[in-house]
Amino acid sequence: MKEQITYDIFNKVDIRLGTVISVKKNENARKPSLVVEVDFGKEIGIKQSSAQITHYYNEENLKGKQVIAVCNFPEKNIAGVVSQVLILGSVDSEGIVTLVHPSQKADNGLPIA
């Protein structure tokens, strides 16, 4: 387990629900990655992420799926892609990511608490 944080620190992390609207391979990445565009609703808009999630996910099965992401990290250039959000998932001992999803469809942009 990582070191404990306070509720005030956790509360600074802006975690939101969004819907994937486009997916394509990041051809410039050293490790297989996808460029994922996510619609977070009117307040935040559409943001993109470069994500190493190709073991289970591709354009066909990810487009239209709701995901959960950290929206207030600084932008980061990853293999020529400006990554604006961090899509959340569990990572197993081999580095394979399983995305976190809501159990029911909900409005884009809703905060996760």
Where are these regions (language model features)?
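Phosphate-backbone binding interfaces of nucleic-acid-interacting proteins
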Residues: 1-113
